[in-house]
């Protein structure tokens, strides 16, 4: 939910730019326009490095999440309610990499917004909506893993395709409704009209959000976060108990049904562990930004610009992390990537390829 200059905070670059507006030596975003924002680009060396780092994140988010979606949707063996939820999460991260990160890269490096007022608002809406969607998806995924680990044998009857579709629909509808209502109703700027007018300039894309909406935004992050932490704490305890039971049973002669249950439980615990790492990565990426945005709004926006930019891009990079996590922990994903990049998925009946060799 952060876009730097079009985030839930006042764009600190823009605020500093206004302070320098009267300086005749300042470089402007639009040299021939009145009320132009001050441009504050980096020197050539750091500029090239920043473009490379930010651009790599955007490319990785787009390509990595596209591979996740392609793998799950193409290979029939991956067609499950839980995996469709993961594919929908990948779609949200893919859209962050496609519609948000490239434009934020230019803004962060050049210090100006060159993409017009209309896309400024859309960019902010996309940022808020897609990042909110990621939060809700991860929350539902954690609940799914809890059901799978707590009782793996009846799990298929509880988390059905219908339940998965409802979770996906809720995640997208709520996040998009929230994002667009926040930006286009103007409610977030209530009480800040004079400040907005004073800080508006050509080449800027800042969003003012009053304390009430900052608090609402923080709650929309905090509540799902608490759910995820609680659920994964329970998953950890259940997994520990199951491991102890399996160790005891290994010393005895187990029935075939018990052996099957153990195999299913082991598989579900591994999936829960992998997705738990994805949730932990999400929290580590986004928690610093949300804490800063909440505190900053009530202390007069005191965060230094460079600190704010670092927090924003750490959060953005989360959209590129999940495919790396899947590739590291899931052999089936590595095999699916190999089949995709080599073009073998274009072959007839490739969708029936066995990705889980015994």
UniProtKB/Swiss-Prot annotation:
TM spans (from-to): 48-68, 84-104, 122-143, 167-187, 213-233, 275-295, 310-333
Membrane topology of this protein: Multi-pass membrane protein
Residues on Extracellular side: 1-47, 105-121, 188-212, 296-309
Glycosylation sites: 34, 210
Residues in compartment: Cytoplasmic: 69-83, 144-166, 234-274, 334-358
SUPFAM superfamilies attached to this UniProt entry: Family A G protein-coupled receptor-like
Tissue: Specifically expressed in neurons of the olfactory epithelium.
Disruption phenotype: Mice lacking Taar2, Taar3, Taar4, Taar5, Taar6, Taar7a, Taar7b, Taar7d, Taar7e, Taar7f, Taar8a, Taar8b, Taar8c and Taar9 show no visible phenotype or behavioral deficits. They however show an absence of aversion to low concentrations of amines such as 2-phenylethylamine, isopentylamine, N-methylpiperidine and cadaverine.
Keyword Transcription: no
GO molecular function terms attached to this record: trace-amine receptor activity
Entry's Gene Ontology cellular component terms: plasma membrane
Superkingdom to which the source organism belongs: Eukaryota
Disulfide bond sites: 37-201, 120-205
Protein location: Cell membrane
Keywords, alphabetical: Cell membrane, Disulfide bond, G-protein coupled receptor, Glycoprotein, Membrane, Receptor, Transducer, Transmembrane, Transmembrane helix
KW Cell membrane (keyword) present: yes
Similarity comment: family membership: Belongs to the G-protein coupled receptor 1 family.
Summary of the function given for this chain in its UniProt record: Olfactory receptor specific for N,N-dimethylalkylamines trace amines. Trace amine compounds are enriched in animal body fluids and act on trace amine-associated receptors (TAARs) to elicit both intraspecific and interspecific innate behaviors. Ligand-binding causes a conformation change that triggers signaling via G(s)-class of G alpha proteins (GNAL or GNAS).
Domain comment, as recorded: In addition to the well known disulfide bond common to G-protein coupled receptor 1 family, trace amine-associated receptors (TAARs) contain an unique disulfide bond (Cys-37-Cys-201) connecting the N-terminus to the extracellular Loop 2 (ECL2), which is required for agonist-induced receptor activation.
Protein name: Trace amine-associated receptor 7e
Organism from which the protein derives: Mus musculus (Mouse)
């Amino acid at each position: 939910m952060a876009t730097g200059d079009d985030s839930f905070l006042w764009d600190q670059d823009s605020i500093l730019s206004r302070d320098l507006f009267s300086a005749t030596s300042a470089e402007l975003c639009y040299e021939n326009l009145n009320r132009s924002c001050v441009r504050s680009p980096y020197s050539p060396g750091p500029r090239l490095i920043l473009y490379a780092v930010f651009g790599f994140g955007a490319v990785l988010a787009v390509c990595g999440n596209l591979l996740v979606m392609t793998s799950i949707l193409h290979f029939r063996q991956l067609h499950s309610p839980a995996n469709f939820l993961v594919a929908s999460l990948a779609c949200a991260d893919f859209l962050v990499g496609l519609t948000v990160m490239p434009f934020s890269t230019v803004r962060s490096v050049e210090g100006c917004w060159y993409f017009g007022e209309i896309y400024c608002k859309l960019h902010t809406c996309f940022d808020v909506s897609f990042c909110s969607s990621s939060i809700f998806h991860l929350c539902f995924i954690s609940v799914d893993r809890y059901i799978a680990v707590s009782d793996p044998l009846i799990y298929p009857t509880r988390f059905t395709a219908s339940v998965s579709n409802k979770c996906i629909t809720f995640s997208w509808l709520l996040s998009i409704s929230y994002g667009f209502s926040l930006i286009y109703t103007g409610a977030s700027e209530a009480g800040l009209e004079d400040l907005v007018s004073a800080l508006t300039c050509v080449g800027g894309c800042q969003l003012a959000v009053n304390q009430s909406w900052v608090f609402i935004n923080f709650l929309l992050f905090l509540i799902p976060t608490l759910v995820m932490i609680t659920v994964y704490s329970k998953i950890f305890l259940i997994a520990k108990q199951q491991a102890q039971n399996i160790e005891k049973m290994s010393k005895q002669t187990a029935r075939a049904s018990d052996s099957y249950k153990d195999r299913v439980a082991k598989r579900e615990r591994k999936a829960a562990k992998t997705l738990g790492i994805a949730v932990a990565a999400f929290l580590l990426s986004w928690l610093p930004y949300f804490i800063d945005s909440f505190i900053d709004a009530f202390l007069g926006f005191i965060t230094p610009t460079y600190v704010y930019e670092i927090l924003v891009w750490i959060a953005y990079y989360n959209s590129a992390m999940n495919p790396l996590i899947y590739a590291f922990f899931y052999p089936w994903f590595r095999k699916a990537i190999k089949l995709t990049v080599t073009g073998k998925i274009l072959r007839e009946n490739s969708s029936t390829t066995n990705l889980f060799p015994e």
